[in-house]
C-alpha cells in the first residue's frame, strides 16, 4: 500500500533504538519513551522549501502527528512544522 501525505505533511517511520539499563537489562517497548527521530518516507506538496526529501532523518516533536500502520509497520503522518531539525551524518 502506498500512502502519499497531502499538503504540508510528511510520512515518517520512527527510528527506535534498543534501550538497556546500566545493568544490561533490555527495556520493553511499554517502558520506553516515544521516539523523536525518524526517517522521511513520503513528502506532501510543501508550500515552502523546507529542504526535506525521502530518506532524510529528522527530529520531531514528541507527541506530533497521527500514528498509522501500513503493512504491519508503524508510521506517523506529521505536519512539516512539527519537524524540529534535520539530522546529517
From Swiss-Prot:
Any one cellular-component term (Gene Ontology): cytoplasm
Any one of the GO BP annotations: chaperone cofactor-dependent protein refolding
Signal peptide (from-to): none
Gene3D superfamilies tied to this protein: GroES chaperonin
Subcellular localization(s) per the UniProt record: Cytoplasm
Domain of life of the source: Bacteria
Pfam families: Cpn10
Keyword list, A-Z: Chaperone, Cytoplasm
InterPro entries on file: Chaperonin_GroES, Chaperonin_GroES_sf, Chaprnonin_Cpn10_CS, GroES-like_sf
Complexes and interactors: Heptamer of 7 subunits arranged in a ring. Interacts with the chaperonin GroEL.
Function: Together with the chaperonin GroEL, plays an essential role in assisting protein folding. The GroEL-GroES system forms a nano-cage that allows encapsulation of the non-native substrate proteins and provides a physical environment optimized to promote and accelerate protein folding. GroES binds to the apical surface of the GroEL ring, thereby capping the opening of the GroEL channel.
Family from the record: Belongs to the GroES chaperonin family.
Annotated NCBIfam families: PRK00364.2-2, PRK14533.1
Protein name listed in UniProt: Co-chaperonin GroES
The organism of origin for this protein: Petrotoga mobilis (strain DSM 10674 / SJ95)
Gene (name only): groES
Amino acid at each position: 500500500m502506498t500512502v502519499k501525505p497531502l499538503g504540508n505533511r510528511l510520512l515518517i517511520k520512527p527510528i527506535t533504538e534498543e534501550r538497556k539499563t546500566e545493568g544490561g537489562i533490555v527495556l520493553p517497548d511499554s517502558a520506553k519513551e516515544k521516539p523523536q527521530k525518524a526517517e522521511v518516507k513520503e513528502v506532501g506538496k510543501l508550500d515552502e522549501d523546507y529542504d526535506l526529501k525521502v530518506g532524510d532523518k529528522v527530529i520531531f516533536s514528541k507527541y506530533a502527528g497521527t500514528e498509522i500502520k501500513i503493512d504491519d509497520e508503524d508510521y506517523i503522518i506529521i505536519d512539516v512544522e512539527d519537524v524540529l531539525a534535520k539530522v546529517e551524518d
